[in-house]
Amino acid sequence: MEPIRVIESRTVVLPRENVDTDQIIPARFLKVTDKKGLGKALFSDWRYAADGSPRPDFVLNRPEAQGCSILVAGDNFGCGSSREHAPWALVDAGVRAVISTRIADIFRNNALKNGLVPVVLDPASHAKLLAAPGASVRVDVEAQTVTLPDGSTAKFPIDGFARYCLLNGVDELGFLLAQDADIAAFEGGRR
């Protein structure tokens, strides 16, 4: 995992509320264990017609959405069943942060473990982002702030250990393995 300190990007806005993990990536795509390529299945039932052709009216298929790495979502994003494939698909599609007023706990934890920054903002700040699709936004993981299109900043909470892992580009196992010498010294002192 690469360290994530700051994400600067234009936003893509998906204002739908209660987007569950089955809408993020339908169950038929969960048979794989490789993260690569899952971005093509992201929001598949919304992005593609029955014949597989892209729906031009879906926000991620529009030319202005290309290259955007910050998704501004409606309230209660990532609800539903626990599937790690949901953040995998978002990251594989180039999304680095999801901003909402509420992000489901299980999705948030899976996102953090996979290098996707879940940002929960107050409703007023979130409304500014919903009203400005394509705006340039800055997510600062270190400062725990989002710089909004009008230049103001909004704070967001993030678990301290998860923040450490994002800033240092390690997952939980990588963190534990990096402590090997200290663990061995501690265990050696107990004998």
Swiss-Prot record:
InterPro entries: 3-IsopropMal_deHydase_ssu, Aconitase/3IPM_dehydase_swvl, AconitaseA/IPMdHydase_ssu_swvl, IPMI_Swivel, LeuD. One of its GO terms (biological process) is L-leucine biosynthetic process. Pfam families: Aconitase_C. One of its GO terms (cellular component) is 3-isopropylmalate dehydratase complex. Keywords: Amino-acid biosynthesis, Branched-chain amino acid biosynthesis, Leucine biosynthesis, Lyase. Its EC number is 4.2.1.33. Pathway: Amino-acid biosynthesis; L-leucine biosynthesis; L-leucine from 3-methyl-2-oxobutanoate: step 2/4. CDD domains: IPMI_Swivel. One of its GO terms (molecular function) is 3-isopropylmalate dehydratase activity. Catalyzes the isomerization between 2-isopropylmalate and 3-isopropylmalate, via the formation of 2-isopropylmaleate. HAMAP family: LeuD_type1 (MF_01031). Belongs to the LeuD family. LeuD type 1 subfamily. This is 3-isopropylmalate dehydratase small subunit. It comes from Anaeromyxobacter dehalogenans (strain 2CP-C). The lineage of its organism: Bacteria, Pseudomonadati, Myxococcota, Myxococcia, Myxococcales.
